[in-house]
Amino acid sequence: EEVVVAYTALTEGIGVYAFPYDVLTSKHKADGASGLADDAANFLVVLRNIGTSLQDMATRKGIAAALRSINPTIASVELDSIQNPQRAYVGHRLGDKTLPLELHQESDGFRRFYAHLLALYQTPPKQTLVFEEPENGIYPGALSLLADEFKATPEAGRGQVILTTHSPALLDHFSADHIRVVELDEALETRIGPLAEEQKEALKEELLHAGELLTVDPARRQDE
C-alpha cells in the first residue's frame, strides 16, 4: 500500500510545466492524463472539469478575476460543448456587445498566462507544481499578477510551487526566505540551498533587491 501511495504521488501528484509559445492551441484532449498535462494538451478537459464542478465556483471566480486584471474586456472563457469540447472561446465585452474569439487567436502571452492559471487552479490540485522560466512571453504587468498567484497557491492548500527563473523582474516579487540557490560544485554535483546569510540580510534591510541577485550581486548558497 505504501508503494502504491508513493507511486501515485510521484506520477500524479507532481506537475512539471514549461509552456511553449503555442500552448493552448492544440486540440488533443489527452484524456489519460491526471490533471493538466505537462504540455497542457488536455486543457479542454481541465476547463470542462473546472466549469462543471459545483464546488469550484471560487476557482472560476479567481481565474476570471485574474484574467480581467490583465485585460478588463474579458467577460468569460467558455467551451463549445460540455460533453465533447473541441474549442474554447474568450468573450470580450465591447460596450453592450460580447465578441467571442477562439482561444488560439489570443496572444502568446495571454495563453501562457492562462495556462499557468489552469495549472495552479486544476482540480484535484497537484501536491507539487514546478514551473520552468514562467516569465517567458509574459509582459511585466501580468508577471506581477502571476507572482501573486504563485504565492497564493500554497496558502490556499493547492500544492507547493517551485519556480526556476532568470528574470530579475520575477525574482523581485519574492522574499529572501523564498529563494533557493542552485550551484554546481567542484565535484560536478548539484547543490541546492538557502541564500547566503549576508545576502539575506541585505535584502531584509533593503540594501539589495531580489532581482539584483541575478545582475549586481550573483546569488550565493549558504555554506553548510
Question: Model-predicted segments: where are they?
Answer:
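C-terminal lobe/lid and adjacent interdomain/linker elements of RecA-like ASCE P-loop ATPase modules
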Residues: S144-E224
